[in-house]
Amino acid sequence: MGQTSCNALSDRLIVIKELVDRGLDPEGTHTILGLMGINAPDTATLAGVKLYSEYLPKAAEKPYTDEQRYLQFLWDSLEHAPLAPATNFAFPFRRIIAQRLFLHCGKNFCAEAIRFNLGQNISAGDDVFINAGTYIDAKGGVTLGNAVGIGEWVRIFTHTHSESDHAERTYAPVVIGDYAKVYSGAMILPGVTIGEQAIVAGGAVVTKDVPPNAVVAGIPAQVIRQRKTEGRCREQLNHTWLYDGAFQDE
């Protein structure tokens, strides 16, 4: 019975991937919502959907395509689906969406319940893992290197507002280097680059660049020491996120 249930989830994911790879329209989106266990609105209603991000200035500069709109809609809809707690459905589902929506999405991408705007401005390398509750403001562009780990409730921002004129915005990209780790509750501010293999401690507010292999903590974040690598680097650091490398087998 258990194996049959797993096969049923796999079969749904196969159909979802085929529909996504074909290019989403209201009909395909309606079908996928049903496969997610959601009582989907009719296709005419789906055709009129507008996302929050489409009311942002950056979206006015480069409007969403219909496909991008439906991909983002499906990503956000998953958290309201009966199958959302089923990790063996939710992880592959998000990967399917990210590989089509993101500017780039490498192999073995893993994400729990996270939110972002303008997913088309996110680039993720291989073996990226993002924990639940994280929010990515991608208006200015976000690049996540290979084997980056991001903890729960991390916030990444790429824009600010003028204090004297709220409508005046400044954008600056965030880059997190290969094998860096950002622990729970940290905040990364616009324009920051976090170096390879660096660690951002939980709750830190990062306002300036972090050197490679540095450990930073505090508000604002300051270098407190070097990462204890014991001579290891990159793959030797064994950024295997779940037991027995689950979902890192592409």
Predicted features, each with a name:
Residues 104-105, 109-224:
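Structural signal for interior beta-strand "rungs" in well-ordered beta-sheet cores
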Residues 1-100, 229-250:
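Terminal amphipathic alpha-helical/low-complexity segments used for targeting or macromolecular assembly
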